[in-house]
Amino acid sequence: MAQKQIKVTLVRSVIGTKQSHRDTVRGLGLRRINSSRVLVDTPEVRGMIRKVDYLVSVSEA
């Protein structure tokens, strides 16, 4: 059975945010505004997304 995937897009700049939030965005593989990554939907990834939910947009892949 294929694992569920989600698409994460950086929609706001990381300028002026906490260093830990910038590190989390980089950990998700996002570099600049409107960059997107398709990631496996795991509890770890969901936790990272929840931490920076004000910076990213999430949709089904």
UniProtKB/Swiss-Prot annotation:
Coiled coil: none
InterPro entries from the UniProt entry: Ribo_uL30_ferredoxin-like_sf, Ribosomal_uL30_bac-type, Ribosomal_uL30_CS, Ribosomal_uL30_ferredoxin-like
Molecular function terms from GO: structural constituent of ribosome
GO cellular component: cytosolic large ribosomal subunit
Record keywords: Ribonucleoprotein, Ribosomal protein
Keyword Heme found: no
Stored Pfam families: Ribosomal_L30
Listed GO biological process terms: translation
The UniProt record lists the keyword Nucleotide-binding: no
CDD domains xref list: Ribosomal_L30
Family per record: Belongs to the universal ribosomal protein uL30 family.
HAMAP family noted in UniProt: Ribosomal_uL30_B (MF_01371_B)
Subunit organization: Part of the 50S ribosomal subunit.
Protein name: Large ribosomal subunit protein uL30
